[in-house]
Amino acid sequence: MRQLTLVLAALVCLAGEPAGQSAQPADPVAALLGRIEAALLDSNPDRYMALLSSLADRESAALFAEGMASPGLTRVVIRERDRVELAGTLPGEGYRLLVEVLRETGQRATLNTWRLDVRRRGSDALDWGVVSQELLTTLRGLYRLTLNTRHQFTARDLVVVSEDVKLTVPEATVFTAETENGPTAYVILGRGDMTFSPAPKGERTQLRVISGAEVLQTPFDGTFVRVHPATASSRITAREMVERPVDPRDLKRAEEMFRHEAAKSFGLDLGDLSADSWSLLPLPGDLLAEIRTRRFETLTYTKSSNEVEDVTLFDRRQRRNLSVYSSRDHLARYGRSYHEDEESEYAVRWYDVNVIYNPARRLLQGQTRLAIETTASSANTLKIRLADPLVVESIVSPEFGRLLSVRVRRQNTIVINLPTTVIKGYRLELVVTYSGTLEPQEIDRESVAVSAPQVPEQPTEEEVPLEESYLFSNRSYWYAQALTLGYAPARITVTVPEPWSVIASGEFESVAPPPGPAPRGPRLRQFTFVASQPVRYLAFLVGRFTEPRVETLSLKHIEESLLASRQPGVYYDELTLRVQTNPRQRQRGREVLRTTVNIVRFYTSLVGDFPYSALSVGVVERRLPGGHSPPYLSMVATPGPGSTLRWGDDPAALPNFPDFFAAHELAHQWWGQAVGWKNYHEHWLSEGFAQYFAALWAERSLGRGVFGSIIRSMQQWSVQESDQGPVYLGYRIGHFKGDSRLFRAVIYNKGAMVLHMLRRLVGDEAFFAGIRRYYNTWRFAKAGTDDFRRAVEAESGMDLGRFFERWIYGDTLPQVTFTSRLEQKDGADLAVLRFEQSGEIFDFAVTVTFEYPDNSTTSTVVKVTDRVVEARVPVKGRPRRIDANRDQATVGVFR
C-alpha cells in the first residue's frame, strides 16, 4: 500500500458526491453500516461477527474484523459510494457495496476502501447481514496536525538545510507539530537569511535574470518547515535549543503561520468523512519550506524525491517558478535528457472521446474511454488529467466495475484507486463521465502568437466585434487523459447546437443528428473525427464555419530515395485537405487552401512524408494574429476587420512574410506532433523547427532576399535576448517576468538560428539527410536534443557534441575578434582571414564579405571550430572592405 501513500502526498480532496449514498433511517443497509461503525469503534471483533449472514465465511470474517477493529480507535466513519444488486439474490434482497472507511486513533487515521456483500437475514426486512468482505485499498499515515501549544523552544544558530538551500536564524523561537515518531512540522520565528545556490548553470542564469545575482540571498522573518520525522535531525540543527515558558504573543504568531501555511501542502480534504484537515508525511529526506521573505514575500522551497526535477523554488505571490531542476542524485539517475514518461504508471493505447458543448453556457458534458496498459512494475492507483471545473460523475472499468477516486486540488489531476494491484502489461479500460463549465483555451506556448502592444490600446469605434470561436486543446484538459502526453489513436465525437460547427483532431468521418429522440430547443449536430495515426493530444475548435473547401493532394511526388529511408509504419499516398473559415473570412478560403497545398507539398519534399491522412485548417478571428496546430488540425488566427493593433515589435512578427503564421503552424504537423519532445526542456525541437521550416518556405516562395531579412531578424532577437537563459530552459524563458516575447526570441528564433548555423556547418546534404533520419527514427515518438544530434552526426560524420552544448545548453554567445590582411602568393591575391574566440569556444560557420571599389561584392564561408582559425581566400584585386557576418547568419558578437 506504500504506492498509494506516495501518489497522494500532495493536496487532494475527494472527487464528487458519494455515489449511491442513502442516509435515510429506513434504509436497512445504512443501518447495517452504522452497526459496523459501532462495532469497530468499540474495538470489538465479536460485535462485527454478530452482524454476519448465515452464509458468511466466518474464518475470513474473523481475520478481517481483527484487522479493522484495532484497539484505540476514537472515531470510525463509513460512507457508501456504490451499490449494485448482489448476484444470486432477488431484487432488493442483497447488494454489493463499495464503501470508504475512516478509522481514527487520536491524531492518526487510516483510510480504507472495502467491498461488502450484504443481504437480508430473515423475514425482517430491516435485518441485514454481511455475506463477505474484502479490503481493497489502504492509505495509512494520515495525521491531524495541530501546533503543540504547550511547548516553546528557543534556538541559537538554527540552520535548515537541503539541496542547494540554507536557512540560518541566529535567534529563533520554535514551535512544532508532532507525530508519534517526532516532529514533522516546524514554525520558526525570527529574522534569518536564506541562501539558495543552484548547481546547474542555467538555473544560476535564471536567478541572475530575476534577482540580479546567480545566488539568491535574502533576509526572512519566519519560515514553516515540513520534514519526515526520521530525517528531521539531518535537516534542522541548532547549536543550542532549550525549552522555555510559552509566550502568548509568540504562540499567536506561530498559530497564524501554522494555520496559513500548513494547508498548502501534503493536505487531504476528506469531504464527508471528516471536516478536519488531515496531512500526509513528506517522504524521508524530502523537505518543504515556506519562507516569508521581505523581498519576494513567500518563497516555497521543495525537495520532492518523487519528481524527476526534484528541487523547486516557487514564488507564491507571482505563482511562478524561480528554479526547477534535478538534484545531483536524480541527475545521475535520470540524466539531463530525461523522458517525461519516466515515472508513468501506464500508457494509453486508444482514446474514444464523446462530448457535448454548449457555447452559450460554456457547458461541457463528456465521456472518455481510455484503453490503457500498465507500464509500472505494479500499481494499485492510476492518475489521470482532467480540468478542475469538470466534476467527475463516475469512473467505471469493465474489468473492475465502479472505481473510487480522489482529486488533487488545483492540479487538474484525479487519482483512481484500483481494487487490486496490477502488474506491468495489464490492460484495462477506464470510462470517465464528467460535466461542468469550462472556458475555452487561449493560444499558448505550444502555438505561436504575437503579444499585444506594450501600451494598451482600446478598440476604436471602427473595430467590428470578432467572429466567435472556441478552442479546446492541450491546456484545456477537456477530456480524461494521461498525465504526460503520449501517442495513441483516437476517435472524437463532438455535439454542438446549430449553427455551430466543429473541426477536430482526426480525419472527418461524419456529421449527423445525435442518436435518440431530438431534444427541445436548437437542433443538435454530432461531428465525428477519427485519428488512425497515434496523436499526442486531442483538440477541437467550435465556430460558425463555412462549408469546407476540400482538395485531395497526391503525395506521390516524393523521391524514391526518400521513400527507401522510411521506417516500418503506415504511410499515405494522398492527403485530404479541408479548409473552413468564419463567414467574414469566406473569401480567404480559396487562398488559404492554395497556400496550404503549396506549403504541405514543399515540406513533404524536404521530410519525405506527411504523417496523417487528413488535415483540417480553420481560419478564425482574434484581436492579434497567431495560430495553434494540434495533430490533424491547424488553426490560423487573423485580426478582425478594422483592427488597429500593431505588433511589429515582436519576435514572431517576421518581416515581409504574410504567410508566416500558416507556414509555422503547418510545420507543427511534423515538428511537435509527428515527432514530439521528451520534456519541456526540449520544446525548441518543436518551435525552433517550425520556425525554421517557415523561414525555408519564405525562401522558396518569396526568394533569398526575404529569407535573408528573416534570418537577420531572428539573429538580432537571438543576440539581444540570449542572456535570458539557454534554449534548454524551455517555457521558463520569460516565464517569471511574464514576458512571452522573451520565450519566442530564444525558443523560436534562437532555436531556428541553431538549425540554420548547423546547416551551414555540416552542409545542406548532411543537414537535410539528418532531418529525415531524425524524423523517420522518431515518428510518433518523443525525442530529445541528443537524438537529433546523433541523427545529424550519422549523416555528417562530425562530432557535434560541443556545438549543441554551447548553442542549446549554454546561454553565452561567441565573442570573436576578426582581422584580415592581404598578401600575394605565386602572383595571386589572397585575403588572410583570422578569427580568435575569447571565452568559451563555439563551432560555427561565418560569412566573410568582400566589397570592392566598384561596389561589387563576393563572399565566402569559413568554418570556425577552434579558438584561433586562419583561412586564406583568393580575392580579385584589393577589396576596400572585408566584413565578417555582414549577413548576420551567425549568432555572436564579432569585433
Predicted regions and their residues:
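Bacterial N-terminal signal peptides
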Residues: 5-15
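A surface-exposed beta-strand-loop module
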Residues: 140-251, 257, 267, 306, ...
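Hydrophobic helix-coil surface modules that form long, contiguous segments used
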Residues: 329-335, 341-367, 373-378, 388, ...
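Non-catalytic accessory/interaction domains
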Residues: 283-284, 290-332, 337, 343, ...
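Exposed beta-sheet edge and beta->alpha loop/turn motif
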Residues: 86-142
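Extended, low-hydrophobicity, Ser/Thr/Pro/Gly-biased non-transmembrane segments
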Residues: 221, 230-345, 431-548, 555, ...
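Short solvent-exposed beta->alpha transition segments
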Residues: 24-38, 45-107, 786-790, 794, ...
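Hydrophobic alpha-helical and helix-loop surface patches within well-folded domains
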Residues: 529, 556-574, 579-834
